[in-house]
Amino acid sequence: QNSNWFPIAAINYVADLLEMPRIRAYEVATFYTMYNLAPVGENLIQICTTTPCALRGSKDIVDVCKKRLNINFGETTSDNKFTLLEVECLGACVNAPVAWIGDEYYEDLSKESMDSIIDQLKKGDLKLSPGSQIGRNGSMPMGQRNSLLDEGK
């Protein structure tokens, strides 16, 4: 409703409305990564870099974003099209590495899939479906049994 961010005045308003100390509302607003306290770009890319994602290659995903967008974490492109943020666990560890773009999770990312996502976002036409980028259904194991009777791949 406010281009993915809200000002301190909004936090104060909510705290006053709920008759709670303003610091309590501020604590909530600064704890969760879905709340931004400063303007962000049209395309907000948040990349998880905690241990499971790091072990599965999130550094490569970060490198692609930084190189393609020519920005670092916490920065917005000069045309205000992209903001890149580093975030803590997004809760999709089994499908790591994960990026949260807009309102969707993109999972099982590779350098190539992230590069394609950025290309599509730059054109304003994101065609890739959210979720696993390698065709996994939910969090099923890769190449292993999916049930007791399954032979695996």
Label the predicted regions.
Residues 1-153:
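Signature of N-terminal electron-transfer/Fe-S-associated modules in redox systems
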